[in-house]
Amino acid sequence: FLSEPGNAYKQCHKKGGHCFPKEKICIPPSSDFGKMDCRWRWKCCKKRSGK
């Protein structure tokens, strides 16, 4: 199964997040979703929205 370019991390993106290196701290009020479907030693962080 090959995903389309840019859609490699569907689970993370569905939650509105992006993959970051594991060392990055997700600063509140961002959410840290953990690894999700990001690559090894990365994690999914959702940056706070402007709403």
UniProtKB/Swiss-Prot annotation:
Gene3D superfamilies: Anthopleurin-A. PROSITE patterns: MYOTOXINS_1 (PS00459), MYOTOXINS_2 (PS51345). One of its GO terms (cellular component) is extracellular region. The keyword Disulfide bond applies. Disulfide bonds join C12-C44, C19-C38, C26-C45. Residues 1-8 form the signal peptide. SUPFAM superfamilies: Defensin-like. Keywords: Antimicrobial, Disulfide bond, Ion channel impairing toxin, Myotoxin, Neurotoxin, Potassium channel impairing toxin, Secreted, Signal, Toxin, Voltage-gated potassium channel impairing toxin. The keyword Disulfide bond applies. It comes from the Eukaryota. One of its GO terms (molecular function) is potassium channel regulator activity. One of its GO terms (biological process) is envenomation resulting in occlusion of the pore of voltage-gated potassium channel in another organism. Pfam families: Myotoxins. Expressed by the venom gland. It is found in: Secreted. Cationic peptide that possesses multiple functions. It acts as a cell-penetrating peptide (CPP), and as a potent voltage-gated potassium channel (Kv) inhibitor. It exhibits antimicrobial activities, hind limb paralysis, and severe muscle necrosis by a non-enzymatic mechanism. Monomer. Belongs to the crotamine-myotoxin family. This is Myotoxin-4. It comes from Crotalus durissus terrificus.
